Amino acid sequence: MTMKLPIYLDYSATTPVDPRVAEKMIPYLCEHFGNPASRSHSFGWVADAAVEEAREQVAALVNADPKEIVWTSGATESNNLAIKGAANFYASTKGKHIITVKTEHKAILDTVREMERQGFEATYLDVKEDGLLDLEVFKAAIRPDTVLASVMFVNNEVGVIQPIAELGEICREKGIIFHVDAAQATGKVDIDLSKLKVDLMSFCAHKTYGPKGIGALYVRRKPRIRLEAQMHGGGHERGFRSGTLPTHQIVGMGECFRLAKEEMAEENKRVGALRDKLLKGLQDIEATFVNGDLTQRVAHNLNISFAYVEGESMIMAIKDLAVSSGSACTSASLEPSYVLRALGRDDELAHSSIRFSIGRFTTEEEIDYAIKLLHQKVGKLRELSPLWEMYKDGIDLSTVQWAAH
């Protein structure tokens, strides 16, 4: 089989729809087109049965009750519904203080900022240099009026896995609603909501080989969590989220979560071996740094800073590799990654970082090609860099006084 270029190594931005998922979706576009809310004929019943089967499949991956799964348009909407919905519902009884983390996805940070505009107070926690949250720092941030805490399961840029079980225990003990953004976690880490003390959890399909435009929010029933709806209309999804359900998208999400449950253990082994091969192949390039803890991390992610190479010029030089610097949602801006800044990386190293994310359809041949290409291009770009020359001459660049410009 000949290798196709460019090589896709950006699975954390999105994944291709697995052909098995696409095949399952197609009948619900044409023949089974009924509205799942149509209760009076078989077109509606067939669609409704498919929606409920998918709800069971999503619940099964995370060991939840299907009744706790609410369909949304994606993880961004789930995050908005969870944070705005819970904070507003409980503000009068619990308080108006929210805790989150500086390395969260923009869908969390911007939602919390919006809550601040509405009169809530927020604490944005620092992480350690390895990207992980210190539990003591989290505990210290809790106030009597803390209503909600939101911490992501797996970071989208550096792939580190936060200590969700421990954080859940702390929140439950203090009576704080605990929300977790698990967009990057499904199919990568085991999630057991019968054990985790998590009240709200956001999911989407397109990071797990399903279609874009569909997600879900887990809303715990015992103890019961209440939310204020953010989307008003026909009262679908038990009033949490109005709007006609997109049966084909939902079927796709159900199927991709079903496959994830079946194949996750094997896939993580294979993907982890490819990631380790990539890391080993790049470690002998001088002045490279891995961003984020390597043990508490999903198998799919490798984020490396190549010192003295500008991230943007690097991406141009390796255009045969589809990779990103920073996350897809913010990589259009030339600002250095706020996640890497929060890990204590300086602007230069944050700017020279590349995120490689590997997935279901990545081959060993592609990884070999990537290693070879990176060795060539990093060398070439550094030859053009006056900073590299100074570094090689033993000059400590942090002591250089640059003229203002």
From Swiss-Prot:
List the PROSITE patterns hit by this protein, alphabetically. AA_TRANSFER_CLASS_5
> Where in the sequence is the active site?
329 (cysteine persulfide intermediate)
The reactions it catalyses are: (sulfur carrier)-H + L-cysteine = (sulfur carrier)-SH + L-alanine
* Lineage top rank: taxon: Bacteria
Q: Name one GO cellular component term.
A: L-cysteine desulfurase complex
| Residues engaged in binding pyridoxal 5'-phosphate | 156
Question: Which cofactors are reported in the record for this sequence?
Answer: pyridoxal 5'-phosphate
User: Which InterPro entries does this chain map to?
Assistant: Aminotrans_V_dom, Aminotrans_V_PyrdxlP_BS, Cys_deSase_IscS, Cysteine_dSase, PyrdxlP-dep_Trfase, PyrdxlP-dep_Trfase_major, PyrdxlP-dep_Trfase_small
Going by the UniProt record, its keywords in alphabetical order are: 2Fe-2S, Cytoplasm, Iron, Iron-sulfur, Metal-binding, Pyridoxal phosphate, Transferase
The biological process GO terms on file are:
[2Fe-2S] cluster assembly
Signal sequence segment: none
Binding residue positions for [2Fe-2S] cluster? 329
Pathway membership, UniProt? Cofactor biosynthesis; iron-sulfur cluster biosynthesis
Matches recorded under SUPFAM superfamilies: PLP-dependent transferases
Q: Does the keyword Transferase apply?
A: yes
Gene3D superfamilies to which the protein is assigned, alphabetical: Aspartate Aminotransferase, domain 1, Type I PLP-dependent aspartate aminotransferase-like (Major domain)
Q: Which residues carry this modification: N6-(pyridoxal phosphate)lysine?
A: 207
Identify the main location.
Answer: cytoplasm
Q: What is this enzyme's EC?
A: 2.8.1.7
Q: Which GO terms describe its molecular function?
A: 2 iron, 2 sulfur cluster binding; cysteine desulfurase activity; metal ion binding; pyridoxal phosphate binding
The subcellular localization recorded is:
Cytoplasm
Q: How does it assemble?
A: Homodimer. Forms a heterotetramer with IscU, interacts with other sulfur acceptors.
What functional role does this protein have?
Master enzyme that delivers sulfur to a number of partners involved in Fe-S cluster assembly, tRNA modification or cofactor biosynthesis. Catalyzes the removal of elemental sulfur atoms from cysteine to produce alanine. Functions as a sulfur delivery protein for Fe-S cluster synthesis onto IscU, an Fe-S scaffold assembly protein, as well as other S acceptor proteins.
| Protein family membership | Belongs to the class-V pyridoxal-phosphate-dependent aminotransferase family. NifS/IscS subfamily.
Name assigned to this protein: Cysteine desulfurase IscS
Name the gene: iscS
